[in-house]
Amino acid sequence: MSKMTPQEMAAKIGSGLLSFPVTPFKADYSFDEATYRANMDWLCGYEVAGLFAAGGTGEFFSLTPAEVPEVVRVAVDETRGRVPVLAGTGYGTAIAREIAIGAEKAGADGLLLLPPYLTHAEQDGLAAHVEAVCKSVKIGVIVYNRDNAILQPDTLARLCERCPNLVGYKDGIGDIELMTRVYSKMGDRLTYIGGLPTAETFALPYLDMGVTTYSSAVFNFVPEFATNFYAAVRKRDHATIHAGLKDFILPLIAIRNRKKGYAVSIIKAGMKVIGRDSGPVRLPLTDLTETEMAELTALVKALPAAAVSQAAE
């Protein structure tokens, strides 16, 4: 069980960069625990405020409800309290509660509640879903606002009154007006996380709206670059930010956007580039082609030597 209160967890994750480690798979697509342990230990050597086990980049959507707590257990065991570990949960309410309870027992410090699977619902239904998950555990919960689960400010306010352990709001839609209204309504009651794909692209404008942190997928394979970029965002170092976007992030996005599902596939490909092969993505996702792998390799090698050499250690 976590030793952190929901409020302590929220304060911690709001203080620095966040990331979602990939979930390594063997050739037969089974969980590769040894590689996962090695990756988690390595990532803990960098300045990161929280790691999300079995999150979106960790292919939560392809893990079974039984696998998620197991992945979380390994993450908690390997990090040894060096960094908070949060777990993904989602699908329908019953399954989301089941995964949440299992993750809490496995030692997770918090939860990221992903949208219900393919279900569109009214605000009252979404609120009841979030409340049911929050009340099934004692650890802190972060709600992921995206796709078919977009909570409006008034709904969030009611939920925060009813659920003291609802402590975070992750934005995955990029609606500036909605984000402004949410922050104006809730203020410091919640910790705000930028959660758009390749969140570095939106990090600076979001900072001015109270979003002090974001989830960096590229931290998986170029952690030195990711942490330096985050530091530049916090300092509002426009020159460093725009150089990082131009030289690495935007070319990476160009490869990612070629095919559906590459937001995850390209991160696993990056792990392979730096010598930390974490296996294939699970179906229905597909891996990068040889040509795309070559392009990604060249992009990573073009980074400053310090970022590449430290990433490959």
Curated annotation (Swiss-Prot):
- Using the record for this protein, list the coiled-coil segments as residue ranges, or answer none: none
Q: Which GO terms describe its molecular function?
A: 4-hydroxy-tetrahydrodipicolinate synthase activity; 5-dehydro-4-deoxyglucarate dehydratase activity
Listed EC numbers: 4.2.1.41
Reaction catalyzed: 5-dehydro-4-deoxy-D-glucarate + H(+) = 2,5-dioxopentanoate + CO2 + H2O
The family database entries (CDD domains) matched by this protein are listed as: KDGDH
Protein's UniProt keywords contain Magnesium: no
Q: Write the record's keywords in alphabetical order, separated by commas.
A: Lyase
Which parts pass through the membrane?
none
Q: Using the UniProt record, name the top-level EC class of this enzyme in a single word.
A: lyase
Annotated GO biological process: D-glucarate catabolic process
Return the SMART domains for the record: DHDPS
Task: Give the family per the record.
Answer: Belongs to the DapA family.
PANTHER family annotated for this entry? Answer: 5-DEHYDRO-4-DEOXYGLUCARATE DEHYDRATASE 2-RELATED, DIHYDRODIPICOLINATE SYNTHASE
Q: What is this protein called?
A: Probable 5-dehydro-4-deoxyglucarate dehydratase
Species assigned in the record: Bradyrhizobium sp. (strain BTAi1 / ATCC BAA-1182)
